[in-house]
Amino acid sequence: MSRRGVLIAGVAGLVLAGLAVSPRALRKVDFFKIRRVEVRGARYLVPDTLVAALRLGPEASLFDRTAGLADRVFAIRGVAEARVTRRWPGTLVVTVREHQPVALAEHEGVLGLMDRRGWVLPFDPTRDPRRLPVADPDAAVALVLGRVMDAEPEVFTGIERAARVGKDILLSGGGHRYLLRSDATVRDIQALGAVVRDLAGRGRDFVELDARFTDRVFVRGMTL
C-alpha cells in the first residue's frame, strides 16, 4: 500500500475508533488539531481578516463545532454567506460569498466600495478591476445601481456618477444623463436600455433619458 493509502487508512481507523470515544476526548488528540485554514471565495476581503475572525486557539480541533465559527465570519461587514467545513486530518475550509460592490462612495473622508444595500464595505478598492461609478452613500442610489447592473449591464458600464435628486436618482456618464425613480423596477430599467439601443442603432445621440414614468421614456437633447 502507498504511503498516502496508509495515511488514509490510519485516519479512517482513528475516526472509526472515535465512534466509541467522546468528541471531547478526540479534541485532545494532536492529530486532529487545526494546522491550516483554507479560504475560498474571497475576492475583496483579505484572507487573514477571515482567519482572524475565527479566533482559533492553540488547542483548536476539527472536532470543535463549526457553526459558531461560521457565525463569526458572517459577522464581518461585507460577508453575505459563510460556511466552515472540515478536511481531515487538520484543515478548516472557510467558504464565503461577499456582497457585490456597485459603486465607489465616500465614507469618513475616503472612497470605499458600496454594495447594493448602500453599505460602504471594508474592501480594498484596488482589488476590483472594474471601473465603478462614484455614488452618494445612499441606499436608494445603491439599490437602483444594483438593478441597472443586473438588468442592463451595458448601460451600467457607461455610468460615471450616481446621485439622489429629491425623490429621484440621476445617473450620468459619457455626456448622457438618466433619470429614474428611486423605486425603479427592472421593467423600467429595461425600457430605458431598449431606448438606448434603439437610438444607437439609428445613429442618434441624446443628452438625457427620463424613465420616471410607467411605460414611457422621454428623450431630451436628441440629435437628428
List each model region and its residues.
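Charged, solvent-exposed interaction patches on well-folded alpha/beta domains
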Residues: M1-E38, L45-A75, E81-L224
